[in-house]
């Protein structure tokens, strides 16, 4: 138990993991505030309406708020769409058109989520942030080490490797010692609305995980300039044809 009751900003996605992270923060004796980062909106070009995706869909935001209400915690939704576009989505597009396959989740964690949450500490007069990632942070002298979560199947430490020391110092990872099964059970014990919610492994800003369609809508002029061509091996031998180099990744 903390000697003084500190305030923690808990990142709330609307899923079961972040909800149980909030539960654990409260059980540890901290005061908590739930924070949902609004990161993206996909707009249907025909209807001009927002298409739900995993990046803070209406259901997800409402789910986060309902969990906070149930646990007696204030909840806020903050708009970081511009930052997410600049740091993550633009890079995602540029990498594909440079012949590389990006990993947007790593950039999102280090350049958007942690940066945004840490910068909100002063706004909310808070001391720490907490997330529902399956990883652990250990202090070694003056350094903070990032370790795998005990649930090796769910371990997310790889997605956090770029997070800076100054951010790790102010981060709690309440699920690092828990298994997914244990997290589900805690959610059921607390009768949380999302206890049985399915997990999503898709990129949160790409509808139906169709990155080709996403690029076609996000940068249509670039996609229009990509032509078909031949696939050759390292010795220059033709081994097939391709429908545009952005549709393939190394080793495919």
Task: Indicate where each model-derived feature is located.
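AMP-forming adenylation/ATP pyrophosphatase catalytic core
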Residues: 130-138, 142-252
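ATP-dependent adenylation/nucleotidyltransferase module used to activate substrates
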Residues: 1-161, 172, 181-183, 188
């Amino acid at each position: 138990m903390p000697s003084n009751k500190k305030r923690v900003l808990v990142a709330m996605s609307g899923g079961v993991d972040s909800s149980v992270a909030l539960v654990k923060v409260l059980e540890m004796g901290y005061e908590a505030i739930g924070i949902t980062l609004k990161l993206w909106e996909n707009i249907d070009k025909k209807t001009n309406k927002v298409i739900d995706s995993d990046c803070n869909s209406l259901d997800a935001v409402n789910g986060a708020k309902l969990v906070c209400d149930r646990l007696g915690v204030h909840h806020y939704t903050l708009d970081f769409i511009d930052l997410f576009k600049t740091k993550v989505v633009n890079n995602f597009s540029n990498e594909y058109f440079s012949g590389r396959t990006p990993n947007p989740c790593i950039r999102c964690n280090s350049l958007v989520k942690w940066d945004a949450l840490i910068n909100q500490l002063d706004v909310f007069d808070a001391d720490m942030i907490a997330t529902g990632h399956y990883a652990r942070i250990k202090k070694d002298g003056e350094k903070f080490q990032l370790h795998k979560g005990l649930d090796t199947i769910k371990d997310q430490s790889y997605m956090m490797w770029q997070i800076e020391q100054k951010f790790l110092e102010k981060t709690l990872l309440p699920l690092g010692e828990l298994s997914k099964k244990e997290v589900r059970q805690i959610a059921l014990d607390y009768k949380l609305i999302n206890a049985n919610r399915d997990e999503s492994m898709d990129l949160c800003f790409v509808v139906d995980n169709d990155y080709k369609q996403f690029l076609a809508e996000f940068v249509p002029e670039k996609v229009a300039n990509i032509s078909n061509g031949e696939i050759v091996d390292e010795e220059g031998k033709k081994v097939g044809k391709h429908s545009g180099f952005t549709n393939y990744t190394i080793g495919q």
